[in-house]
Amino acid sequence: MKEKHQIVIWPVYLDANKARNEGRLTPMSCSVKTPRVMEIFKAAEKLGLHPEHVTGKAHPAAWADKSGYVLVDNIGPKTDLLRRIGTEIIRMRGGKQ
């Protein structure tokens, strides 16, 4: 369950295959193609954000995809956290997407 000091990170927020009006919140330079929840979890863990994986939940715009989301500590603006997580996933995948 989400606490006040946590932010929800849905995979669509970092998905380079989605347009901004489809839910992507990061610039293309910090986005990745089809991000997986476990990639987001591992990137947040490496950044020290104390992630929690919540399964069986679907983003309202993609109600059929119940891959879940990741809760991370709220240590700053959401866009900054998303950019850091996206950049870390790119690094984990081995470079530019």
Swiss-Prot record:
Sorted UniProt keywords: Cytoplasm, Ribonucleoprotein, RNA-binding, Signal recognition particle
Stored Gene3D superfamilies: Signal recognition particle, SRP19-like subunit (3.30.56.30)
A family per Pfam: SRP19
Localization annotation: Cytoplasm
Keyword RNA-binding included in the entry's annotation: yes
GO term, biological process aspect, one: SRP-dependent cotranslational protein targeting to membrane
An example Gene Ontology molecular-function term: 7S RNA binding
GO cellular component, as recorded: signal recognition particle
Keyword hit for Ribonucleoprotein: yes
Source taxon at top rank: Archaea
Family that this chain belongs to: Belongs to the SRP19 family.
HAMAP family in the cross-refs: SRP19
Entry function: Involved in targeting and insertion of nascent membrane proteins into the cytoplasmic membrane. Binds directly to 7S RNA and mediates binding of the 54 kDa subunit of the SRP.
Summary of subunit composition and partner proteins: Part of the signal recognition particle protein translocation system, which is composed of SRP and FtsY. Archaeal SRP consists of a 7S RNA molecule of 300 nucleotides and two protein subunits: SRP54 and SRP19.
Protein name (database record): Signal recognition particle 19 kDa protein
